[in-house]
Amino acid sequence: MNKVIVVGGGAAGLLAAAAAAEHGAQVTVLEKMFKPGKKLLITGKGRCNITNDCDLQEIIKNIPGNGRFLNSALRQFTNEDVVKLLNDNGLETKVERGGRVFPVSDQAKDVVDTLLKILHDLGVELVTDICVTEVLTDTEKVIGVKTKSGKVFKADAVIVAAGGASYPGTGSDGSGFKLAEKLGHAIIPLKPSLVPLTSDSPYIPDLQGLSLRNVQATVYSSGSKAASEFGEMLFTHFGVSGPIILSLSKTVAALLKANKTNIDLLIDLKPALTFEKLEARVQRDFEQYSRKQLLNGMKDLLPQRLIPVVLDQAYLDEEKPVNQISKEERKRLVEVLKGLSVSITGTRPLAEAIVTAGGVSIKEIEPKTLRSKLWQGLYFAGEVIDIDGYTGGYNLQAAFSTGYVAGTAAAYQ
């Protein structure tokens, strides 16, 4: 019976352990935190967006960070396989808007508990509060791991599934990259992905906590369009966040890395309406509220807190009577409604990112087995690999698929 050590008890590590045990290996999971699955507990705002109910190509499309590398892993362990595994072990799931799959209970804890139940039933040993500092090798193969306390765990195969470098309080502190680097693996430079953006626009503090739905946000760099997303966003005390902002953050991080500093976010507040139709809508509202001041004449069009900001960008006096607004002023107003400008200064720190971009280079990993090309018996799974996707369950699916494939291959090492 092969002995397999899994370093990390997150989504990828738990699936790797389950797969290895299912295929006959003696498995030990070494988790540095007191409890496994801590990052899983905070995903999907504590609800755990398990995966996405879409086809393979759509999943790959939504993992812009080396998604094609995952083609084999995603075929070997699909989104349907994830859902079936959880359902078969007592966890009911549901599909929400955008194909996002959640537990019916809306509790991430139930997902973690189900995965731990699977490991228990398969006889997997789980050791917590233990820090792996070195993967031990002999000539061309791995032979085990060494911990911070000096304890050695012998193994025929080691799966590094220690996560990325975001949310270090959950154990995802970049330690997996150090293990790989010590073994000679190339680490693609780390940067935040799925991270809020910072802004120095003066009105940001006034909009803190304001959520916008069904808007189109577009990133521009020195006037050139870089990326665009439709959906929901949120103004914060430091800038902007929310699903579409997180999706755009990868583009912003890349622009910043390329020393692009003139970055703006233009928000189309009414993307369903063309310029002409929106202008007609504004004109109807102005006719209805012709005797009111401009600030009060737009209450049917925008959230109250947003109106002064829009009027300011359109160079309009909020106290001016609606019936005195000229055609030219109305056009200026519509231009801002179709492109509210937010100056972007940067991203929040890597530690606050939902996902880490960068990691162990995919050029040194076999895509069909997730085995290291440098060492026999060494495997990688999850966020430690240089893969990252958008919000919507794609990153967890990547973790589950790579974990399952690495675990299966390691069992036969």
Task: Map each language-model feature to its residues.
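N-terminal Rossmann-like FAD-binding beta1-loop-alpha1 element of flavoenzymes
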Residues: 2-29, 406-411
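Short hydrophobic core segments
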Residues: 5-7, 30, 132, 145, ...
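Glycine-rich FAD pyrophosphate-binding loop
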Residues: 21-45
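An anion/pyrophosphate-binding glycine-rich loop and adjacent beta-alpha core
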Residues: 34-36, 41-42, 50, 56-57, ...
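Glycine-rich active-site loop/strand segments that organize a redox cofactor
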Residues: 47-95
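Feature captures the FAD/FMN-dependent oxidoreductase FAD-binding
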Residues: 76-157
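A glycine-rich dinucleotide-binding beta-alpha-beta segment and adjacent secondary-structure elements
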Residues: 127-130, 134, 308-388
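Glycine-rich loop(s) and the adjacent beta-strand/alpha-helix scaffold that form part
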Residues: 153, 157-203
